[in-house]
């Protein structure tokens, strides 16, 4: 038998039924679902120190359980001494079971470890049902060994859903247990 993540099982068993009732969908195919989660980190100092970018890629891979890809600058920015095509960050795109595992780990294990945590901003939707937020310290994830990190850095998380608007997307994420402050 194949392994099914807890959050995916919960989505299929409970969330779909609750959202059909709440939004009165005619078919369960209309119910919004998670499409992908993109976790990225920008390393501005990588211009001067390539070792920081390599450690960011390693940390991102440890956090997500999937190999991170280095990202390149789209255009040159003289003020930051960045040339076009220069590697300045890393990202991971999670889909399928890995996506549900990461979301579970984020909601139930990592975010509660943030000092003075009161929830994340519930207004950071983009109008198309996608939600983005930043995490200020990568050390909230248990996979990161505090003694072995080069420097404390933040990361960006974008949750892409099939919802057509923000209201449906927020309802979906609330059902998953996303700790919104408002």
UniProtKB/Swiss-Prot annotation:
InterPro entries, per database record: Ribosomal_uL5, Ribosomal_uL5_bac-type, Ribosomal_uL5_C, Ribosomal_uL5_CS, Ribosomal_uL5_dom_sf, Ribosomal_uL5_N
Heme recorded as keyword: no
Pfam families xref list: Ribosomal_L5 (PF00281), Ribosomal_L5_C (PF00673)
PROSITE patterns: RIBOSOMAL_L5 (PS00358)
Protein's GO biological process: translation
Entry keyword annotation includes tRNA processing: no
GO MF entry, a single one: rRNA binding
GO CC terms of this entry: ribonucleoprotein complex; ribosome
Alphabetized UniProt keyword annotations: Ribonucleoprotein, Ribosomal protein, RNA-binding, rRNA-binding, tRNA-binding
Biological function: This is one of the proteins that bind and probably mediate the attachment of the 5S RNA into the large ribosomal subunit, where it forms part of the central protuberance. In the 70S ribosome it contacts protein S13 of the 30S subunit (bridge B1b), connecting the 2 subunits; this bridge is implicated in subunit movement. Contacts the P site tRNA; the 5S rRNA and some of its associated proteins might help stabilize positioning of ribosome-bound tRNAs.
Quaternary structure and interacting proteins, as annotated: Part of the 50S ribosomal subunit; part of the 5S rRNA/L5/L18/L25 subcomplex. Contacts the 5S rRNA and the P site tRNA. Forms a bridge to the 30S subunit in the 70S ribosome.
Protein family per UniProt: Belongs to the universal ribosomal protein uL5 family.
PANTHER family: 60S RIBOSOMAL PROTEIN L11-RELATED
Name of the protein described by the UniProt record: Large ribosomal subunit protein uL5
Organism: Borrelia garinii subsp. bavariensis (strain ATCC BAA-2496 / DSM 23469 / PBi)
Gene: rplE
């Amino acid at each position: 038998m194949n392994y099914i993540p807890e959050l995916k099982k919960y989505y299929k068993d409970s969330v779909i039924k609750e959202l059909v009732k709440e939004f009165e969908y005619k078919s369960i195919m209309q119910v919004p679902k998670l499409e992908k989660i993109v976790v990225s980190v920008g390393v501005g100092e990588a211009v001067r120190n390539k070792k920081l970018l390599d450690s960011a890629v390693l940390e991102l891979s440890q956090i997500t359980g999937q190999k991170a890809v280095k990202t390149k600058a789209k255009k040159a920015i003289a003020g930051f001494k960045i040339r076009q095509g220069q590697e300045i960050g890393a990202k991971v795109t999670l889909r399928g079971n890995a996506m549900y595992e990461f979301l579970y780990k984020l909601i139930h294990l990592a975010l509660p470890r943030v000092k003075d945590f009161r929830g994340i901003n519930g207004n950071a939707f983009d109008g198309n049902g996608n939600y983005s937020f930043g995490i200020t310290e990568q050390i909230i994830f248990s996979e990161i060994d505090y003694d072995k990190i080069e420097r404390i850095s933040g990361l960006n998380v974008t949750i892409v859903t099939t919802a057509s608007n923000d209201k449906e997307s927020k309802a979906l994420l609330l059902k998953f247990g996303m700790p919104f402050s408002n």
